[in-house]
From Swiss-Prot:
GO terms for cellular component: cytoplasm; endopeptidase Clp complex. PROSITE patterns: CLP_PROTEASE_HIS (PS00382), CLP_PROTEASE_SER (PS00381). It is found in: Cytoplasm. InterPro entries: ClpP, ClpP/crotonase-like_dom_sf, ClpP/TepA, ClpP_His_AS, ClpP_Ser_AS. One of its GO terms (molecular function) is ATP-dependent peptidase activity. This is ATP-dependent Clp protease proteolytic subunit. It is an enzyme of class 3 (hydrolase).
């Protein structure tokens, strides 16, 4: 992946930054692509860094993700709740599966999407191999995770758990306006809110 660099001029000279480092100075974190352990570790580190820099200022988490590993997503979710600053979530492009879950986990009143974003929720995916006993253990674990995800989505959207469970049985796609009505986001952004 090509990462652009920007040059900042000051009275002390010029300094170049990769674009993500420059955005981090403005408290912006980009969650882009499939969510896995390596990406989650980077997001968690940035959240913790920004909290240490200033625990009173909001953090802006831009999401463009098809989803990914549940435990990786949970590490981001738990950190969002652990730190003091509010985390504003903004969907750009798509927020599907774990991406949509994290979008819904932004601070209340601070969950946004750009107009042409695509949002999708569904039940967790899993693949089990091995002996019958191992498959049974994996099935129980994925059902446990499904319950946790549904409970958190119900809390975030103010929907009943039964509705979340029904809607996530299959891929459930929403426009940004539908996601707002559903309670996954608070507002569709036409212009920057900063």
């Amino acid at each position: 992946m090509f990462i652009p660099y920007v040059i900042e001029k000051s009275s002390r000279g010029e300094r170049s930054y990769d674009i993500y480092s420059r955005l981090l100075k403005d408290r912006i974190i980009m969650l882009s692509g499939e969510i896995h352990d390596e990406l989650a570790a980077s997001i968690v580190a940035q959240l913790l860094f920004l909290e240490a820099e200033d625990p009173t200022k909001d953090i802006y988490l831009y999401i463009n993700s098809p989803g990914g590993v549940i435990t990786s997503g949970f590490s981001i979710y738990d950190t969002m709740n652990y730190i003091k600053p509010d985390v504003c979530t903004i969907c750009i492009g798509q927020a599907a599966s774990m991406g949509a879950f994290l979008l819904s986990c932004g601070a209340e009143g601070k969950r946004f999407a750009l107009p042409n974003s695509r949002i999708m929720i569904h039940q967790p995916l899993g693949g089990a191999r091995g002996q019958a006993t191992d498959i049974e253990i994996q099935a129980k674990e994925i059902l446990r995770l499904k319950t946790i995800l549904n409970d958190i989505l119900a809390k975030n959207t103010k929907q009943k758990v039964a509705k979340i469970a029904k809607d996530t049985e299959r891929d459930f796609f929403m426009s940004t306006q539908e996601a707002k009505e559903y309670g996954l986001i608070d507002k569709v952004l036409e212009k920057s809110f900063k």
